[in-house]
């Protein structure tokens, strides 16, 4: 038995994206000289980013030279996959005499993010100084292969010298691939913060009423000027 071809349905197209339910139909051909026995076809995931919902199909004997459709196998893609992560399966075909196995793999489309620009509005020198309260504005681009519906944002840190306020966004509905959002939040720096002190804050990117979560790191350095941190990705 030879894996001849396959077709899939994922959402509204044939591109597999994060958190989608997918149906996969296989065409198998009997390239032998004799009719096969009763066949069992099983699609077995080899990666942890996919969950089978319909993994096994039984097929009547296949005559020599015939091609039959098997499926549709059904599976769900994990919500939290990286853009272009690979999902890998083994298709196991067995009759009463012998078995065959074929690898099948796909890449998954998902959002991904890049900091395009950042600004500090402090009414002064454009840097985060000890004892100062400033507004940080970030332009974040979706550089991935999929859009994010109803994006949500949280910002937090775990640092004794910094305190971050609530974050706001100019887009709460649909963040398409290749487009940007503008994020703003208030940051206060302790009077005791030493110049040059560095910390990592995090932007938690989510999607409303889903389990989607992407942690975007945001380095912060006290006393660094705009023209320096833009080059080095520091605030």
Model-based region annotation:
Residues 219-235:
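Extracellular carbohydrate-recognition regions
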Residues 29-50, 57, 141-163, 167, ...:
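Short acidic, flexible loop segments centered on an aromatic residue
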Residues 74-112, 188-222:
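Terminal connector regions
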Residues 2-12, 118-125, 231-235:
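Short, solvent-exposed loop/edge segments of extracellular or virion-exposed proteins
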Residues 12-20, 125-132:
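Short, solvent-exposed loop/linker segments at the N-terminal edge
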Residues 24-29, 65, 89-91, 136-141, ...:
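Buried hydrophobic-core signal for structured, non-transmembrane domains
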Residues 51-81, 162-193:
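Intrinsically disordered, low-complexity Pro/Gly/Ser/Thr-rich segments with frequent PxxP/GP/PP motifs
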Residues 1-5, 106-117:
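Proline/serine/threonine-rich low-complexity linkers at boundaries of modular beta-sandwich domains
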């Amino acid at each position: 038995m030879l894996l001849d071809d396959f077709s899939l349905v994922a959402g509204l197209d044939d591109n597999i994206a994060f958190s989608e339910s997918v149906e996969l139909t296989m065409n198998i051909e009997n390239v032998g000289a004799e009719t096969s026995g009763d066949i069992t076809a099983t699609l077995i995931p080899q990666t942890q980013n996919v969950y089978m919902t319909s993994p096994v199909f039984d097929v009547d004997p296949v005559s020599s030279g015939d091609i039959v459709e098997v499926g549709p196998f059904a599976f769900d893609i994990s919500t939290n996959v990286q853009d272009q992560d690979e999902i890998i399966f083994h298709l196991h075909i067995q009759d009463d005499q012998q078995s065959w196995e074929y690898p099948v793999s796909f890449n998954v489309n998902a959002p991904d993010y890049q900091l395009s620009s950042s600004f500090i509005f402090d009414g002064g020198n454009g840097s985060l100084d000890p004892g100062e309260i400033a507004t940080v504005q970030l332009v974040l681009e979706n550089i991935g292969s999929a859009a994010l519906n109803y994006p949500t944002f949280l910002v937090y840190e775990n640092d004794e010298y910094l305190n971050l306020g609530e974050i706001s966004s100019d887009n709460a509905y649909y963040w398409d691939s290749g487009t940007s959002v503008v994020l703003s939040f208030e940051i206060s720096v302790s009077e005791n913060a030493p110049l040059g002190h560095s910390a990592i804050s995090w932007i938690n990117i989510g999607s409303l009423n889903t389990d989607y979560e992407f942690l975007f790191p945001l380095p912060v350095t006290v006393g660094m000027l705009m023209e320096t941190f833009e080059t080095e990705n520091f605030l």
